[in-house]
Amino acid sequence: MPGQITYLDYNATAPLRPEVIRAMTDVLRCHGNASSLHGPGRQARSRIDAARRDVASLVGAKADEVIFTSGGTEANNLALRGVKAARVLVSAIEHDSVLRAAPADNAIIPVLPSGIVDLAAMDAMLGETDTPTLVSVMLANNETGIVQPVAQAANIAHAHGALLHCDVVQAAGKMAVDYTALGADLLTLSAHKFGGPQGIGALIVRNGLEVTSQMRGGGQERGHRGGTENIAAITGFAMASVLAGNALPALMVDMSALRDRLEDGVMSITPHAVFFGRDQQRLPNTSCFALPGVAAVIQVMNLDLAGIAVSAGAACSSGKVARSAVLSTMGVDEALAGAAIRVSLGWATKAADIETFLTAWAMIAGRVNLRQAG
């Protein structure tokens, strides 16, 4: 990484893969509007069509189910605002782009202390009325990495005649995602979480389901999203999707081993550290833990001074550091939630990066112990 930074914040954004940079650079040298009928326009359209197939393949969807957007936030907004539903249910641990896109009168599905969505509560909430309902449950939480029982949630939703939207932004490229097996009606993706460029994402929409455009204009994306397509970003998204899909089996094994080494090392250095979701199915790259008595911002800043990049909770709040709402929803004590950090690995993480982190962690723990002893 530039400047010898040890980057362990992949859940915030992943470094661009070199192959993605090359693919995008090649396209940036070309010109042509995909809506034009001449040669350059047809070439641009061909690139988009090929990219649509590659992105769909990553999650087992069909190419004509892919709607390109400016990212996960826009895709989530399109799903929650574009689907006709008199009622919206969202899980309490959803990304802010889901929680804030939902209507003001939406209902919140509670989460168990384990970090898993309360399916019994969801079932009961759906049974309260027979009005058209949209349910939104993410596949993997961005802070804890805990994987949610989306297929079960979809079965419950469909049994009540409801639709299910699933945000897989954090999961894609880090675990296998099968659109059909999940049973979701809509799926949100974002390229920059697995080595693609920022500013490009997609909403997968089941064939036959109507979604009203929230971006009016020239009728691109089959009328779902107006505006000239960002062909370079779409090409980068596609290349990242192909690379992620090909590398996934080995990457999952490698990331799990590195994460386990990280957590074992942290426990050895600071036995009083508290891990969240360690007894649940998690993303293989994500570790969320707290050092009691030491604010998350202090930990993050000290690690930053040591040249290591990690996060205090989610990284989508304009640089603000606040107590984790996800952990609070799980019933975690306020002080402990305020001491939680997230370490997330990715395609370029090496064993040496974990050892660098643990060396810095030992130094930070030593300073904390000295202050407490004094």
Task: Cite the ranges covered by each PLM segment.
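Pyridoxal 5′-phosphate
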Residues: 1-374
